[in-house]
Amino acid sequence: MNNHYHPTGHRDAKTYAGDRPWPQWPGVPSGLSSSSGLLQNRYYAPAGPFPLLPYFGELGAGPDTAMNQAKRQRAEVSYQQPRPYPTGRGTGSMGYQSKVRVTDKYKVVGFISSGTYGRVYKALGRHGQPGEFAIKKFKPDKEGEQASYTGISQSAVREMALCSELHHPNVIRLVEIILEDKCIFMVFEYAEHDLLQIIHHHTQQPRHPIPPNTIKSIMFQLLNGCQYLHTNWVLHRDLKPANIMVTSSGEVKIGDLGLARLSYKPLHSLYGGDKVVVTIWYRAPELLLGSRHYTPAIDMWALGCIFAELLSLRPIFKGEEAKMDSKKTVPFQRNQMQKIVDIMGLPTKERWPLLTSTTEYSQLSTLQPPIHHGGHHGHHYQSQRQAAAANAGVSHLEKWYYNTINQQTGGSGPGSGTSPLASLGAEGYKLLAGLLEYDPQRRLTAAAALQHPFFSTGDPVSANCFEGLKTEYPHRRVSQDDNDIRTSSLPGTKRSGLPDDSLRPGKRVKEG
């Protein structure tokens, strides 16, 4: 039995066995009306016998009409209120435990990373529970010698609720939740690598591109995981290389659902309570332009940015984030939008009919149209600007793509050069353009992207993104000098061993 995905999107029977029922397409997941679960579908969601997830416009109609008021109210209560998680559901091992000490069940090996949420540690199982695990400890509301406990953060509640219900090979698996001394510990399966680390490895001298079959496998698995989330009405909202885990067997897993939200009510603004979502470099244009009724399309834009980064080994839209003002209002992210315009051209009403309804539409007039640098030498700067203004809406993404995949040969058009990435060809560009479509309603869905010819041409897509590679990627850095999981002090968010500018957006700038 081989280990490849079929063009339909299923893996061989080894993974998508007949004893797992096909996910039922929900008007709204019926499990939302039950106190026992948030999501009806806990099974795999390969591209197959479902209709596409509908993408709603700013005021689109949707599945909300298929669910009566009583069910909606029960769903909201089920989602918003934290509750103990019963054991023995899903995979059979995930549960909520409040009378067990984390160090009794796990031997902490060392510290992996930290962020605004808390810290992540690597651990080994004890007492007949073999294997490696990642333990995420949420920091207390107020830090100090004596932690102050005032409740569970909204982000923690969301992540616990969603992770306890989501079960898919391309989504990181939650093993259990432990509450100890008013601290929450989420125990996840461990992945030896993350996508940021893999990209960084290829930037080391001699710089070498990620092999095309590896890129195909990574993108297919990401899209497969995203389709599962979107089929279950979950928006991830923070897809970026640092949040994509990769196991030693080459299985790609979407992680960090701290910003994820349910999206079954298209008329309900998803903006309230979440001033900013998605790391700036991967933020979709509708978010930058102030859209409040965004859709799963924001995740697809982020996947397009990740695809481009796998090709070029650097973020395609590397802008600087503007600070909030004293009133805590979110400013227009002019610099980031300009980075997008430089490659994609200015958005137009023809390309994006609902563009004028975005709250920051007027700000587009403050942006500079892209200058095409491939013209004849000797042209005056002013004439370049005039030409740019006349073609402000023209995208240069195709030129960027072919320059990138042919970078080792200097070619700039389809089929030129012998770079390893040249085999991705025109279908690679079409997939990238579909993911980086300005109009969220025209942007590729995860299901449609899985059916794209990019994945059915050339070698079969492998379920192991490392298949055939001679490269051995270093494992995630673990600091064994810092393995006290009980400590309350937290370091900065930077992870050692990787360049700062690859971990987070550049220095923030104050917008006038």
UniProtKB/Swiss-Prot annotation:
- Locations of Basic residues compositional bias? 373-382
Q: Which GO terms describe its molecular function?
A: ATP binding; cyclin-dependent protein serine/threonine kinase activity; metal ion binding; protein serine kinase activity; RNA polymerase II CTD heptapeptide repeat kinase activity
Report the residue ranges that make up the Protein kinase domain in this protein.
Answer: 106-455
Look at the named UniProt entry and state the broad enzyme category this protein falls under.
transferase
Name any cofactors this protein relies on.
Mg(2+)
Q: What is its EC number?
A: 2.7.11.22, 2.7.11.23
Q: Where is the composition biased (Basic and acidic residues)?
A: 476-485, 497-512
Keyword check for Nucleotide-binding = yes
Keyword list (alphabetical) reads: Activator, ATP-binding, Kinase, Magnesium, Metal-binding, Nucleotide-binding, Nucleus, Repressor, Serine/threonine-protein kinase, Transcription, Transcription regulation, Transferase
Q: Does the keyword Nuclease apply?
A: no
Q: Which GO terms describe its biological process?
A: negative regulation of filamentous growth; negative regulation of transcription by RNA polymerase II; nuclear-transcribed mRNA catabolic process, non-stop decay; positive regulation of transcription by RNA polymerase II; protein destabilization
Q: What does this protein do?
A: Component of the SRB8-11 complex. The SRB8-11 complex is a regulatory module of the Mediator complex which is itself involved in regulation of basal and activated RNA polymerase II-dependent transcription. The SRB8-11 complex may be involved in the transcriptional repression of a subset of genes regulated by Mediator. It may inhibit the association of the Mediator complex with RNA polymerase II to form the holoenzyme complex. The SRB8-11 complex phosphorylates the C-terminal domain (CTD) of the largest subunit of RNA polymerase II.
Its protein name is Serine/threonine-protein kinase SSN3
Protein's organism = Chaetomium globosum (strain ATCC 6205 / CBS 148.51 / DSM 1962 / NBRC 6347 / NRRL 1970)
